[in-house]
């Protein structure tokens, strides 16, 4: 089955999607398939298209994307790496995965690193991270420090340098994983090299004019 934690271009995912396309193609009597992808699923499909261009062209008729983060998901991903994610609040949160537990999981997920903001994209307004930090040179005065989200690896490394998990009496270090980051950088290259076949129709569905704390997208 599909594992959202893994990279969007691992062999198992690519082979699995190919098998499903072939099965659907044969079951329909040789008719091409229409793919509908949502959110990160769009990255998986785009990786497949980039790495298996001829196969994609053979089996796919239309590709419809709904809210796919092709240039990354700065707000969600940066927050995930720094503080984790919390899906449920209030009393219900006692019955769901905690923000801390989710954070420790996401730090080791290749898919999360693959949704860091694209540094090569010409953003209308570059995403930023705001962090309140003590300044030791000013008697510990707390200051608001801004980081461009497309160039904040040093922030992640510093924030997670002492991050660790205790499991079965053992302490496991969970810093910002540079090996995974390098893998994700290669994934970004694969995504950017993707070319839509002339025979495939492409539709991208996304919201516009949504007010955020800094801009309207």
Whereabouts are the PLM-identified features?
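C-terminal subdomain of alpha/beta-hydrolase-fold enzymes, centered on the catalytic histidine
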Residues: 146-217
């Amino acid at each position: 089955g599909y594992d959202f934690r893994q990279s969007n271009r691992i062999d198992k995912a690519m082979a699995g999607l190919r098998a499903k396309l072939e099965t659907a193609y044969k079951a329909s009597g040789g008719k091409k398939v229409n793919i509908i992808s949502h959110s990160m699923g769009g990255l998986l499909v785009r990786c497949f298209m980039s790495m298996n261009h001829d196969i994609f062209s053979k089996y796919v008729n239309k590709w419809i994307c709904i809210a796919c983060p092709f240039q990354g998901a700065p707000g969600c991903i940066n927050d995930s790496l720094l503080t984790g994610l919390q899906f449920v609040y209030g009393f219900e949160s006692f019955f769901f995965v905690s923000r801390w537990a989710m954070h420790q999981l996401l730090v080791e997920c290749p898919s999360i690193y693959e949704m860091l903001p694209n540094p090569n994209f010409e953003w209308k307004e570059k995403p930023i991270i705001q962090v309140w930090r003590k300044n030791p040179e000013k008697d510990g005065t707390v200051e608001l420090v801004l980081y461009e989200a497309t160039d904040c690896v040093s922030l992640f490394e510093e924030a997670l340098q002492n991050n660790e998990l205790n499991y079965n009496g053992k302490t496991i270090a969970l810093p910002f994983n540079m090996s995974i980051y390098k893998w994700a950088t290669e994934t970004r290259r694969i995504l950017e090299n993707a070319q839509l076949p002339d025979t495939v129709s492409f539709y991208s569905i996304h919201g516009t004019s949504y007010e955020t704390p800094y801009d309207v997208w």
